[in-house]
């Protein structure tokens, strides 16, 4: 699970995530990239839910599909995600109640403006066009102000809210806060913050890794 905060308007999209991945017991497992950009499609792919699934889809979309632009990609995405999800669940022995949502944000090859879509496993990955505006997952207060300045505060609130939930229901958020800023000219990756326990989590990650490998 992850923090995902995004904002879209006709000429730009901002997609921000944390970087912490945890083991099944909630202990820090690794730091990872949770959103990526495909330059030749002018498209950002991100996801929540089953860790790593959206990254596998990004690799598939960027190297194994003959498509031109986000609308063309969107046409093929529901079928492609459905097939990949079945393989992914078997490979990682996921239970039937496991869920994931994949998001795609891109510059339209038709209009030159930002378009975005969500694909939820609970809805058979059907394409859901998203309106311009702000999206947050998990829930938090949508603040006003400079977006890159307020996103870290919003993620801190998300993490505080999740910390009050039972471990098996909690979304674990941590590491660094990375924002992707997409315009018609390209995409910039920007570190806009980090969590106060970043160093402690990094130490725990290497300690856990050493225990597993020794």
Question: What are these language model-derived features?
Answer:
Residues 2-90, 122-214:
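Conserved short S/T/G-enriched processing/targeting/catalytic segments and their helical context
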Residues 43, 98-103:
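Generic beta-strand structural signal
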Residues 92-93, 102:
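Accessory structured domains or lobes within enzymes
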Residues 94-98, 172:
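Short helix-terminating capping/connector loops at secondary-structure junctions
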Residues 97-100, 118-126:
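Long, charge-patterned amphipathic alpha-helical coiled-coil/hairpin "stalk" segments used as oligomerization
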Residues 103-110, 180-182:
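Short hydrophobic alpha-helical segments used for membrane anchoring or interfacial signaling
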Residues 111-116:
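Structural motif
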